[in-house]
Amino acid sequence: FNIPAREILPKPKQDPHPPIWMDCTQPSSYEIAAKHGIGVLSFGSGAPAGMKQHIDKYREDIKSAVPVGGFVNNKWANFTLGHCGDNDQEAKELGSKAIKEFFGPNRPYTADRADVYERLLESWGGVPDHLASNFSRFQGGDQDLGGGGVPRAQLGELPADLLAERGVIVAGNPDSCIEGVKRHQEIGADQSLLIMQCDQIPHTKVKRSIELFGKEVIPAFKD
């Protein structure tokens, strides 16, 4: 094979070793990571505004860490869905559809978890006041869904623009995606972990999204 020189991240060989990270989804795991001087890979889906308190506590707790490795890795990475497209609204709608399907019924992250949609709805920022009266149709009367169906239905009705505005998804055209990443940056996150290859997004659009992130979004954070 004739492979041109390429930069590999993270570096497989580092002194004394590559940074140690921990997959975390809840406050107790953030505390464990801080206690042992481990970086947080936060895979809990949520709006940045709701994550700030956890990042602040992690930063404070890690000051007294007893590191399990050769150094303290005081870093926090937020997971979210990322989709960048040439058409702003189309990309937001597709990103919204993709993350809702990602957490759809009987998916790995939702199967056999009775309260998953109630918790997701809360972590995504809840039902906004201006939509509360419209969403009330899911409770009571002929459309009463009961048994966790209400928060699932409400979650499914949250507008794409709202999810993007809250930073639940980083989606839209390059300018919107830059603003979305900034929402995570502003609460103290060091990195954004963007899942792009969801099954609801066609492969050609995934490739275009990667191209736009590489050419237009990432350079905005070069400094």
What is each residue range found by the language model?
Residues 1-9, 49-189:
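An alpha-helical appendage that flanks or caps ligand/catalytic pockets
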Residues 2-38:
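Aromatic- and glycine-enriched pocket-lining scaffold segments that form the walls
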Residues 20, 33, 58, 91, ...:
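Conserved, mostly hydrophobic/aromatic
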Residues 20-23, 38-43, 74-81, 192-194:
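Hydrophobic faces of well-ordered beta-strands that scaffold small-molecule active sites
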Residues 25-55, 59:
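A conserved active-site cap/scaffold subdomain adjacent to cofactor or substrate pockets
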Residues 32, 36, 183-190, 220-223:
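A structural motif corresponding to the C-terminal end of an alpha-helix
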Residues 45-48, 194-207:
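Glycine-rich, proline-tolerant flexible connector loops at the mouths of alpha/beta enzymes
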Residues 84-88, 202-212, 222:
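Short glycine/threonine-rich loop-to-helix capping motif typified by GTGT followed
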